[in-house]
Amino acid sequence: MTLAEGPIALAALLAGTAVDRLLEPSGRRSVAVAVAGAGAGLVGAYDDLYGSRHAKGFRGHLRALRSGELTSGMIKILGVGASAAAAAILVQLCRSSCATPACRVLSSLLDTALIAATANLVNLLDLRPGRAAKMIIVLGSGLVGFGAAPAVGAAAGSLPTDLAGRSMLGDCGANALGAAVGTAAALALPWQFRLLAFAAAATLNLASERVSFTAVIERTPLLRRLDQLGRREPVLSMSTNDQT
């Protein structure tokens, strides 16, 4: 099992945003997607390379921080948040619906939260072959006209080796593609639907602290069939990192 799929997916994402930049009149949309994806991917790669697994989940990293330890997971959380905030500012420049400074600030905060929550949610799913890549394709397919096409293409390209169990997206690829799709959602949706999307992503992130997504999927016949679709052989586990 190799983690090389993650950097390759990140490179494919950035190449796709570069092409999108040439086709887009203003270029701001593709830059926002690239900023979110690159930032999340880089800190994810750091966690892949140097991460310690003794602290898991957001609460675990907070407990470690209170004890004076800055974990690689907390560095990733901060890095994903910072890149999401930068992307949210660029998203706001693409938007004309906010006429007041207060509206722009609130809108940017919502976009930041949505992008970061989506990035982490996709990463939480990267525990079985093809699961995270399938989620990117499902979430991003309806957003290809808003900057998600590079993420969908990168996920589709990684799917064969991922499903075969030869490689995985890891924190680098999963966070990068998740952040890119989250940015596309921020670009595409009105604030009411962005709020609902964030609420759903945040709820799932919080639920992961107590509930095993894999166990839920295994107990649900439809989800189990979709999860196993295209998988060549049963795999017990792809990663020891089952939380952020």
Label the predicted regions.
Residues M1-V211, A215:
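"…together with the soluble PPM/PP2C metallo-phosphatase catalytic core" -> "…together
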Residues A200-T244:
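Membrane-proximal soluble regions of multi-pass membrane proteins
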